[in-house]
Amino acid sequence: MLQNPTFWVLVAFVLFVAAVWRIAANTIGKALDDRAERIREEIEQAQKLREDAQAALAQYQRKQRDALKEAENIIAAAREEADRIRRRAATDLEASLRRREAQAMEKIAQAEAQAVQQVRDLAVDIAVAATERILVQNMDATRDEVLVGNAIAELPAKLH
């Protein structure tokens, strides 16, 4: 058997396979270890990215809640401002209407006073004209002298 070349080929083949196996096992083991390390790093990176994404999502949700609260505050402030403007406009309108009513009442009072004055003036004019006509119709020279004499006699008493 030691003389048989097939035996030595078999021994050489087994030694070759063992050497290749040892080298290949180390290389394959190292390659598998490297690949496992890369996979572990990728998993860690994926977990880190997931945590970052969750943090970003939480931050976005906080910002969205804050934005909604701010929008609600802005809407509430706008409503308050609109109510304040509406109340001020109503107050201003009411004051304006009161002023216009007072002005109208004043104009009406002035017109009434003017009308009353015109009626009085007209009544005085009519009374003077009627008195003049009556005096012209009823006066004669003797009566005229008596009235003038009486008026002159009463004059010193009225002056003192």
UniProtKB/Swiss-Prot annotation:
Q: Name one GO cellular component term.
A: plasma membrane
Q: How does it sit in the membrane?
A: Single-pass membrane protein
Query: Where is the protein situated, by its record's location annotation?
Result: Cell inner membrane
Q: Which domain of life is it from?
A: Bacteria
Stored Pfam families: ATP-synt_B
MF (Gene Ontology): proton-transporting ATP synthase activity, rotational mechanism; proton-transporting ATPase activity, rotational mechanism
Alphabetically sorted, this entry's keywords are:
ATP synthesis, Cell inner membrane, Cell membrane, CF(0), Hydrogen ion transport, Ion transport, Membrane, Transmembrane, Transmembrane helix, Transport
TM stretches of this protein: 5-25
Q: Would you identify the family this protein belongs to, as annotated?
A: Belongs to the ATPase B chain family.
HAMAP family for the chain: ATP_synth_b_bprime
Subunit structure of this chain's protein:
F-type ATPases have 2 components, F(1) - the catalytic core - and F(0) - the membrane proton channel. F(1) has five subunits: alpha(3), beta(3), gamma(1), delta(1), epsilon(1). F(0) has three main subunits: a(1), b(2) and c(10-14). The alpha and beta chains form an alternating ring which encloses part of the gamma chain. F(1) is attached to F(0) by a central stalk formed by the gamma and epsilon chains, while a peripheral stalk is formed by the delta and b chains.
Summarize the protein's role. F(1)F(0) ATP synthase produces ATP from ADP in the presence of a proton or sodium gradient. F-type ATPases consist of two structural domains, F(1) containing the extramembraneous catalytic core and F(0) containing the membrane proton channel, linked together by a central stalk and a peripheral stalk. During catalysis, ATP synthesis in the catalytic domain of F(1) is coupled via a rotary mechanism of the central stalk subunits to proton translocation. Component of the F(0) channel, it forms part of the peripheral stalk, linking F(1) to F(0).
- Per its record, how is this protein called by name? ATP synthase subunit b 3
Q: Identify the species of origin.
A: Rhodospirillum centenum (strain ATCC 51521 / SW)
Gene name? Answer: atpF3
